[in-house]
Amino acid sequence: MEMSKLLVKDLMNGKFELISDYIYQIENYVIRVPKSFVTDYASIPRIFRAIVLPYGKHSGASVVHDYLYSKGCELNIERKKADKIFLEILKEEGVNLILARLMYIAVRCFGKTRYKIKK
């Protein structure tokens, strides 16, 4: 459940900076994405942007997922769990189920190189 509004500043380079903390509660987690975190929302290849934009109903899920993948994330969440959380938020936010599954499959198949191992 979204606990705060997602407020961003467009950096005019395909990236967006949070202007306040974004808080989302899912399962046993309260995920606080900090102010100043930079995201590109969903990393959609240009060829598919006619079908799916990088932002939309999936924006909150994308920001949380980017944060969970980042080195700055203080939560000790493995990549597979981060991807499941992404899928659950997509569903909660009312993203079309087929699109949600496709986005989940995409992060499972192509997200490995972006995941930062927490130490």
Predicted regions and their residues:
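Extended terminal accessory/targeting regions
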Residues: 1-119
